[in-house]
Every structure is written in C-alpha cells, then in structure tokens.
Amino acid sequence: MGKLTLLLLALLVWLQYSLWFGKNGIHDYSRVNDDVVAQQATNAKLKARNDQLFAEIDDLNGGQEAIEERARNELSMTKPGETFYRLVPDASKRAATAGQTHR
C-alpha cells in the first residue's frame, strides 16, 4: 500500500507542476487571456473608428449638404453673394489660452 500511495503522490506532484508551470499551464493561460483583452480593446477602438468613417462616407454620398458643410468648415468657402467673417479673440484671451496649452 505504501508504494501505491507514493506513486499517486508523485503523480499528483507532477500533474500540479504541469498545471502551474508547464506548457499551456495557468501562467500561459493568464498571459494569453491578458493578450486577448488587450486585442479586444484595440479592436473596439478600430471598430468605432471604422463606423465613424463609414457614417461619414454615407453622409458624403447621400447629399450635397455634407459636402457643402465640409467645404465651408475646412476650406472656408462661401456661396456667391455671401461674406465670410472670422471672429478672432482679443490678444489677452489668446495669450491666456496659449499659456494653458503649454503646461
């Protein structure tokens, strides 16, 4: 009976070692699980960006309003007969804002 107990104990120790430190053990499982969580977070960010880009593409394909808005905002374009006014904050506000952004 003693040899069987010793054999079973040795088998248990070997199995525990394999579970904790062996290939595909608990350590590898936790590392891979962390990698999966990080990849899922990256995928979620990229999916949100893709959804935003697809929405913008649909908006641009859908009508002239989006194209006109983009031309006005990014290129400062105006329609014939319109006057473009740019409101510039006074120097003291610009200096205060510039000082806050460089901190």
Curated annotation (Swiss-Prot):
One of its GO terms (biological process) is FtsZ-dependent cytokinesis. Gene3D superfamilies: 1.20.5.400. Residues 33-62 form a coiled coil. Residues 22-103 are periplasmic. It is found in: Cell inner membrane. Residues 1-3 are cytoplasmic. It is a single-pass type II membrane protein. Keywords: Cell cycle, Cell division, Cell inner membrane, Cell membrane, Coiled coil, Membrane, Transmembrane, Transmembrane helix. Belongs to the FtsB family. Essential cell division protein. May link together the upstream cell division proteins, which are predominantly cytoplasmic, with the downstream cell division proteins, which are predominantly periplasmic. This is Cell division protein FtsB.
